[in-house]
Amino acid sequence: MIPKEVKGRDINWHTPFGPVIMETQISDELHNILLTRADQLRNGTHPNPNINTETNDYRTRLAGCLSEEYSYRGAFTEEEDAFVEAELTFLAAHYTLAAHKASKVKENAVRDANQIIMQKPLWVNYMKSGEWNPSHSHTGKISCVTYLRVPKEIDEENQRGEHTKESNTPSAGRIEWSFGNVGMPYSSGGYIRTPVEKSIFFFPAALSHMVYPFKADTERVSMSVNFDDRIDLEQALKQDGERGKKEKL
């Protein structure tokens, strides 16, 4: 029996399950602020004499198995701080719109930038050969990671390294998010991306993710921060009791 032609039929596909990951780029100005201040903090040339690699060591607060992770606390001028927050909360708000367009949340979950709270401080990771970030999640509602310095040697390792070039999943230095049932037919439980300089990813803070180590004798620099939802927090403060009865206004 010859199957009937598809022409004339309505065929639709849906992706109703799983989270949304948004990828875009940061501005040149934001990139310059984040990388310059991080490098100054690290090499002891930061204009703020009260911060250094000891005062801003952030490793005990993070899951990463890295030798250098620093917070940006005290690293920005007031003008820089306002610029950083404005751009990142704008992008985080756009993430809520993207989630709505992907039919993951209702329209009343879309937020403006002033309804997004950035959880300070931001932090920077200097990732070196053999270091990694184990599977973990973050606090808040939304998380992001952006890449400030990405050496070409890491991508070359995936293409030409003896340990990676024949693999069907070359993953040196790559980031992977995981969700749901791995191995289910017609489904994917993981999403792997290759970091690119100035690229930034937004995703649910509770979404598990990890970063694979690389062997190349080089160093990659990334920045992360989390965000909360001002509307949700205000509503939570108005609730009481086990059933979350809302306070009458």
Residue ranges and their predicted role:
Residues 212-222:
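Ligand-binding loop in jelly-roll beta-barrel domains
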